[in-house]
Amino acid sequence: MCLVCTHRIVVYRYAEFHDILSEYFIFMALYLRKKLDNKAEIAVWQVTETEEELLNLISVPTDELEEISLFRSESQRKQKLAVRALLNEVFEEKMYLNHHDNGQPYLENCVTNISITHTDKYVAIIIHDEDDLGIDIESLDRDFSAVEKKALSEEEIEDLDDEKKNEQLAIYWCAKEAIFKRMSQNRVDFAEQIEVEKFNLKKEGELEATFIHKDEHEEEFDLEYMIFDRHVMVWLVG
């Protein structure tokens, strides 16, 4: 059988399975939905469902199902489906998600700005009607030691506490990733172009950071972060 025919069968069965499961009730794992003072909104989905259960929760166009089915990793497919489950939860109307050439997500049928992040266990989105956004989430079970050399400035390295280093590195990394997503630029040097001010590690807190453009123009940002269930999440609006 040719590869094209095989792929068509996989896509067909994927969509068919979604239709079969639609008659069953599945418990939704919306972990957090939070409206911020700046009128942005954050929603977090805990991925506890199977792939089949996630399919039952959502209504996805055939072309999007085809795109999701191309991912070989079940974890990646579940993350994509969980994003769509969040969109269904947050928006009253059906949203169509797409991506720019640089990978930045956008909603085809809505002017609302969106940023997306995910781990194996959690998927999160942040939305705002006008302002640019950035969000990133990471598991604290990951070893962030490599971040120190590749993404931190000398001043940031000096501010590290040996007893809390991995947590601090995770926050630094998430903050810089969130800013990177917000700026939507290619080839950003995290160590040289994004400077995060020293902070006191807490379960929830605020961060100050500076993005240095290649023409040396500086842009300042205020970020927020929270730690939950061995995960760190950092976001910014504006």
Where are these regions (language model features)?
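Cysteine-centered motifs
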Residues: 2-5
